């Protein structure tokens, strides 16, 4: 359970301002989800909506449009695409309606569900039960060198008997870390 909590902390702290409690700024000095990721040639990369919005058809479509407009360090468009929608347990029903409905949700029109029809989120959605913010949603992209998980020392367990008490002593040890290298790996 500890490993899942630490992995989810990357997204739970994704909006925390640098220097704030729980912040985990990237190499550019700003939080993972931010509108002010500096680019080497000037300007900024935004991997969040300009205005915070709840998960709905409009916010999801705008997020995908913004992902398609990601720029590299030279200011050129990349071919990065959204791959998977990540939601907390509180948004699982909304995510299911948005991703699986044949027709548009929350409308009387008989329009197709463009998100599903176009297959713009090919890996669908997943519910992460360790996310703390009930209305935050994330789109994992196919950006290379994004999220990181390093296992420095694999899990090792040791069990031995205590001669004096007859009790069995058991210990486990492992070293790992979670992080990110490229903020283009996620949009939130």
Describe every region a protein language model picked out.
Residues 15-42:
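Active-site cradle of extracellular carbohydrate-active enzymes
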Residues 71-74:
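Short aromatic-glycine motifs in intrinsically disordered, low-complexity regions
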Residues 33-69, 79-84, 90-188:
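Sequence/fold signature of self-assembling virion shell proteins
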């Amino acid at each position: 359970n500890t490993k899942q909590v630490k992995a989810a902390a990357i997204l739970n702290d994704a909006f925390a301002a640098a220097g704030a409690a729980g912040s985990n700024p990237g190499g550019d000095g700003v939080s993972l989800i931010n509108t002010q990721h500096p680019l080497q040639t000037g300007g900024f990369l935004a991997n969040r909506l300009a205005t915070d919005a709840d998960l709905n058809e409009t916010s999801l479509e705008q997020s995908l449009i913004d992902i398609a407009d990601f720029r590299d360090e030279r200011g050129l468009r990349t071919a990065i695409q959204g791959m998977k929608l990540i939601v907390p347990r509180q948004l699982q029903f909304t995510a299911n309606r948005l991703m699986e409905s044949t027709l548009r949700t929350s409308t009387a029109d008989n329009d197709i569900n463009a998100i599903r029809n176009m297959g713009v989120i090919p890996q669908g959605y997943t519910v992460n039960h360790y996310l703390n913010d009930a209305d935050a949603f994330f789109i994992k992209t196919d950006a290379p060198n994004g999220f990181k998980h390093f296992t420095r020392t694999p899990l090792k367990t040791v069990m031995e008997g205590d001669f004096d008490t007859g009790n069995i002593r058991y210990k486990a040890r492992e070293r790992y870390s979670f992080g990110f290298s490229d903020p283009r790996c996620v949009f939130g």
